[in-house]
Amino acid sequence: MLNIQAGATRARSKVVVKGCILGPSGIGKTSQLWTLDPATTLFVDMEAGDLAVSKWTGDRIDVFKEAQRMELPVWEFAVNLACWLGGPSPLSMTETQTYSASHYKYVCELFGDPKALDKYETIFIDSITVASRASLSWCKVQPAAISEKTGKPDTRGAYGLLKQEMVSWLTQLQHVDKNIWMVGILDKTTDDFNRTVWSPQIEGSGTVNALPGIFDQIISMVELTDGDGGKCRAFVCHTLNQWGFPAKDRSRCLDLIEPPNLGTLMEKIAAGDPGVPSLNLSMPAGSAAHKVTS
């Protein structure tokens, strides 16, 4: 029998958030760990750049060292970890596919009993930038990235496989019943019209384009100018912002600018009750929409 979740039950269910914090190098993304409870947070370190949080007392997985110890490519380790965190995926149509029940069984034998994860409420992954590089390196040596005609590397094939791998990995993590937060580098470039463009430093445009559909929250951690002309760090949380930073707030509980504190941000989302849709769906009086005639 199909289980239809009642509205009252759904309203009482635990709030878990999937989010990504993007920011320039050195802005303090990894240091957001200090705002999280070390007793219930697992730090997945792909960067080997944890100097800023070396005294943080929570649990940590050193992805590079563990992959090296298990004699696995870094990307294969990351995929196995996502499977271990999320369990078998109903999106896997055969037992030979990644994230299938067979894959999950193999991963549990490799990593151990997944009950070890029960104590964690939040998984903090540093970073999606490095994950995409590891994925691309792996994709470049797969058969799909080698031309059948010439036997030479096929760049288009490699990037096509990269999109599949990254989106599948992120989707697997999306369905983990825990808070999932990733951090990544935010690049600043200038286009042909001398306009500033902010974009995630992630290999493959397909992955970048898929992010808003996967994550609940996309936060840009950036430097802004305060009312006194001084510089300050801030979280930019709304898609419509005057600076063009990538951002999204599915919770509808956040202001345009929030203090740069992930722990406080999560508490606000968990406690917030947006009620009826808070989006402003009306058009400005002087907009082009009001001038259209039949």
Short names for language-model regions:
Residues 10-13, 179:
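Glycine-rich phosphate-binding loop of ATP-dependent small-molecule kinases
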Residues 2-9, 108-111:
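A short, compositionally biased domain-edge/stem linker segment
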Residues 118-210:
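P-loop NTPase motor core
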